[in-house]
Amino acid sequence: MSKKIIQVVLKENIQKLGKSNDVVKVATGYARNFLIPNKMASVATVGMLNQQKLYAAIKEKKIIFAKENARKTQQLLEEIQKFSISKKTGDGETIFGSVTEKEISQIIKNTTNVDIDKQNILIPEIKTIGLYNIEIKLFNQVTANIQLQVLPESN
């Protein structure tokens, strides 16, 4: 006896099946007895499939738009290339505390008016005066490399 298969639209992410709003083929019994009663999916009608195509096209346009913005931000940051921050120093070139992602994000915002989430900034441990390479993840496969000049704070 062969399995009967039905198309459903997922309403939430289901491991090993798909993500929310995906159209997937599942066994009729699985859909009728588990997915639909638990409001995890609904039967894919012609209208729903058309709506899914429209949703996918809009999502694709948003991704393209976000990637273009990320590339523009990358160009802007790499044109400036070097950002500076002043920190209080102790003995020699050692600074008090360290430079954080939040501080770098604030410097970039003040300089370029571009808001970058601190979680997307990858920095080495900065404890001394000097020049450091910073990597900023802007989008999938779009990163900007900048330099951060840590200077002693003048009194």
Swiss-Prot record:
Example of a GO cellular component annotation carried by this entry: ribosome
MF terms (GO), sorted A to Z: rRNA binding; structural constituent of ribosome
Disulfide bonds: none
First-listed, main subcellular location of the protein, grouped into a coarse class: plastid
Cellular location(s): Plastid, Chloroplast
Record keywords, A-Z: Chloroplast, Plastid, Ribonucleoprotein, Ribosomal protein, RNA-binding, rRNA-binding
Protein's GO biological process: translation
UniProt family annotation: Belongs to the bacterial ribosomal protein bL9 family.
Matches recorded under NCBIfam families: L9
Record's function text: Binds to the 23S rRNA.
Protein name (Swiss-Prot/TrEMBL): Large ribosomal subunit protein bL9c
